[in-house]
Swiss-Prot record:
Keyword Cytoplasm attributed: no
Record InterPro entries: Flag_bb_rod_N, Flagellar_basal_body_rod_CS, Flagellar_FlgE/F/G, Flg_bb/hook_C_dom, FlgE/F/G-like, FlgG_G_neg, LlgE_F_G-like_D1
Name of the encoding gene: flgG
Lineage, broadest ranks: Bacteria, Pseudomonadati, Pseudomonadota, Alphaproteobacteria, Hyphomicrobiales
A Gene Ontology BP annotation from the UniProt entry: bacterial-type flagellum-dependent swarming motility
UniProt xrefs under NCBIfam families: FlgEFG_subfam, flgG_G_neg
Protein name: Flagellar basal-body rod protein FlgG
Length: 262
């Protein structure tokens, strides 16, 4: 009985949907987190009767067919790269991007990866790093005697040395854009990796046309909407229950047939 296998695909799909929703809710306070959404597509179809062919008496063309679907499959889990709200932290090393763009980060193995989380700090040598100690690209080293640091909206890094009246420029941040941000691969630790689907990074200066502005003393919060997640959670739960009832009904029908054959 095909209803059993069809409903089973529905239960599997809703289980994955539930896992995606659970991960969104778990990361509701994760800086720069981008909400994920499960995408589904229908499976193959089985033709019981084709449309557009002669009828049994060969006197007319059948206008509609009988084609039965065989269930559902997961086609993608898409990260929605929508701007999150900004939170004022008062920390000079906290940076938010307003608009399209990604901070570039170098991992210990030399790979350049990308993040929207601008929770930065300096390491023992004054290099600008992430909270996990990964270096920001291009590299910026803050002098030990700097008494003030300023990140402009265009990514210039300025410091005040001692009691100097003027700021000195010590670096320039650049950010990366991608033609297909949905093609980036999430790695964990708020990092994403480029893939053939995302295309190569387009590197530019903040505040240039098509590139985000940098906002100092702010962080971009998660773009998860709690109300929507709870609504989606209830919808997924109901869909799972309905598929479960179909399996139960199909099992009862099969039991009835088996009983009548005895």
């Amino acid at each position: 009985m095909k209803a059993l296998s069809i409903a089973a695909t529905g239960m599997n799909a809703q289980q994955l949907n539930l896992e995606v929703i659970a991960n969104n809710i778990a990361n509701i306070n994760t800086t720069g987190y981008k909400r994920a959404r499960a995408e589904f597509s229908d499976l193959l179809y089985q033709t019981e009767r084709a449309q557009g062919v002669p009828n049994r008496s060969n006197q007319a063309i059948v206008p509609e067919g009988a084609i039965i679907g065989l269930g559902v499959q997961t086609s993608a889990v898409r990260n929605l790269h929508i701007q999150g709200s900004l939170v004022n932290t008062g920390n000079d090393y906290d940076l938010a991007l307003v608009g399209r763009g990604w901070f570039q980060i170098e991992t210990p193995d030399g790979e350049t990866v990308y993040t929207r989380s601008g929770a930065f700090n300096t390491n023992a040598t004054g290099q600008l790093v992430t909270i996990d100690g990964y270096t920001v690209v291009p590299g910026v080293t803050v002098p030990q005697d700097a008494t003030e640091i300023v990140f402009t909206s265009s990514g210039q890094v300025m410091v005040r040395i001692g009691n100097d009246t003027e700021l000195q420029e010590i670096g320039q941040l650049t950010i990366a854009n991608f033609v297909n941000e949905a093609g980036l691969e999430p790695m964990g630790e708020n990092l994403f990796r480029q893939t053939p689907a995302s295309g190569d990074p387009i590197v530019g200066t903040p505040a240039d046309p098509g590139f985000a502005q940098v906002k100092q003393n702010y962080l971009e919060s998660s773009n998860v909407d709690p109300v929507k997640e709870i609504t989606d959670l209830i919808s997924a739960q109901r869909a799972y229950e309905m598929n479960s009832k179909i399996i139960q009904a199909a099992d009862e029908m099969a039991a009835t047939v088996s009983k009548n054959l005895r």
